[in-house]
Structures are given as C-alpha cells and as structure tokens.
C-alpha cells in the first residue's frame, strides 16, 4: 500500500483531550511526571505549570545551570539580536524605532559575543548526546552565534533561510531589503546521531515553499509569513515567530514525548508547537509580561481545541 501523504492541518490539531492530555492541569507537587527528576533539580518554583508546559521567570543562565546534564532532547533559541541601539525600521509605512527593550541593547561586540558563548555552552551541557539546537537570528547576531557554536564543539547540520514574503521595505534605499532570517541547526556532538524526521519533511502536506517542488526533499529555504493577526490576539513579542515556523522545527527534529527547551521563550510559540504535538516544554524568560502573554496564548489554544472536539 503506498504511503499516505500526511495532512498539515491534522498535524497542527492532533490533540485528543482525554485523561492523558499533557495540557491537563497537574498538581504542583506532581509537575511533569515524566520529567519530575529534571524539574526537581530547579530550586525555584515555576512561574506557571499546566501539564507538560512549564515556564520559569529568571535569567536563562541561572536556570540552565540547575538542569541535569544530558537531559534535554531539543532546544530552540531566539536570543537577543542586540538591535535596540538607535536603529529604525518601517512599520505601516512609518519610520519607527526598533528598540525592543533593555534586554536587546548591545553591550559592545566583545560583551555580546561573550554572552552568546555563555548561553550556548550552558545549552551544550544539558542537551542529550544526540540532541540538537536551533538558533534564529538576523545578520546582526547570527554569525556570532555560529562561531560560538563551533567554539563550544557543536556540529552544524544546516543553516535555514527563513524567507519572509511580506518583508518591510528598506527606508534608506541604500541597501537590499532584508527579507529573511537565518536559523542554524546544530548537533551537540559531531559523532552523534541526531533525530530528523526525513519522511515527514519530504512527504508531508506542507504549505507551499519558496522554490519547493512536489516529491523533492525539503530544502533549506522556507517561505513562511510572519505571525498572522490571530497569533497576536493578546499582544505580541517584538521578535515573535510564526507558529508555522516552529511547527516545522519541532516536527523535524523531535518525537512525541521529547523534552524541548526555549531559553528565551518570549510569547512561547515554541511551547505552543510542542503542545500541539505532544512534546514536553520548558520555557525561560526574564519578562513577566511575555510570560503572561504565553499563558494567555496557551489557554486560548486549549479552549479552541476543546471547541473543535465538540463539533
């Protein structure tokens, strides 16, 4: 019998709300039963916990240092781009400052690079031997991240060009319009055997990609629109990623039941992608308002999924 092409919408909405649902509210004393040992190693109480979706409010370096070695299957990181130092962009036809917050202020080339070295090193320790990390960034930061990965002995697997079809124009008219971000995918150890769900990436019924053709391997240029209006219902993070992007990342490199961590979780799009596909999620951020936004987004997701099951 020929292999049946998997439907993308089914992949996104594949939850059954039953007693085994990982989004079911757990007692604080029973956090993430499969990962109880991991969470018990963290001294502070979670900012929020619902089933296998857990958030912490703290500096990621402090939290990562408390996690057990070789305990995380996959990490997605969207670290500060350090753009908030006088730059401008175009928004709705107007020139606006790109200052995202004090957390995005540059401390100079050396200090910024030292930061990337520190957090990637901390992530390397907690990844499982065959674990992988994805890092998203623009040209302002991604090259420093790439060098930091190599210094910390990761093995780079791919660099993905996330092409944005509706990118903002360049106001100065002196440069090419920046219409993509780069995502680096790397393995913890050069000799490891990382997870890659090749068949799903090749044969899944994904939205049409830039230069993608049927029955060919998925390529490293992904055409995905920035977050849709409905993804910003409760507000947005200034570097919020679209759910379609994180769904692809999560489904490409993890299996059901795997533990995914986001050290700069923001509005927790990574966590929502995990919740939709039965992965366990740990998110870390320093900003209360973005953790609260994450909680509202998760609760809305649960509400929508319950409504769909009643139809």
Segments and roles (model prediction):
Residues 41-50, 295-311:
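Short, conserved SAM-binding/catalytic segment
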Residues 1-34, 40-293:
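Core catalytic lobe of class I
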């Amino acid at each position: 019998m020929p292999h049946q092409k998997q439907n993308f919408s089914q992949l996104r909405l594949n939850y059954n709300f039953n007693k085994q649902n990982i989004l079911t509210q757990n007692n604080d004393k029973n956090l993430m039963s499969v990962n109880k040992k991991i969470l018990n190693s963290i001294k502070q109480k979670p900012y929020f916990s619902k089933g296998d979706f857990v958030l912490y409010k703290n500096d990621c370096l402090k939290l990562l240092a408390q996690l057990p070695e070789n305990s995380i299957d996959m990490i997605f990181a969207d670290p500060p781009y350090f753009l908030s130092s006088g730059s401008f962009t175009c928004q709705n036809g107007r020139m606006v400052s790109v200052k995202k917050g004090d957390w995005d202020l540059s401390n100079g080339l050396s200090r910024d690079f030292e930061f990337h070295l520190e957090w990637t090193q901390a992530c390397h320790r907690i990844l499982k031997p065959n674990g992988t990390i994805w890092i998203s960034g623009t040209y302002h930061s991604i090259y420093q991240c790439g060098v930091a990965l190599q210094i910390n002995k990761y093995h780079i697997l791919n660099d993905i060009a996330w092409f944005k079809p509706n990118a903002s124009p360049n106001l100065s008219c002196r440069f090419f319009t920046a219409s993509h971000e780069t995502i680096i995918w790397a393995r913890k150890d050069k000799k490891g055997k990382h997870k890659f769900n090749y068949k799903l990436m090749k044969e899944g019924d994904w939205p049409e990609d830039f230069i993608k053709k049927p029955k060919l391997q998925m390529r490293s240029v992904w055409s995905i629109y920035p977050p849709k209006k409905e993804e910003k219902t409760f507000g947005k993070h200034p570097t919020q990623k679209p759910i379609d992007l994180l769904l692809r990342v999560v489904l490409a490199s993890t299996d059901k039941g795997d533990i995914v961590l986001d050290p700069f979780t923001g509005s927790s799009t990574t966590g929502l992608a995990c919740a939709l596909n039965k992965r366990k999620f740990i998110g870390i951020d320093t900003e209360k308002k973005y953790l609260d936004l994450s909680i509202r987004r998760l609760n809305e997701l649960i509400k929508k999924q319950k409504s769909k099951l009643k139809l």
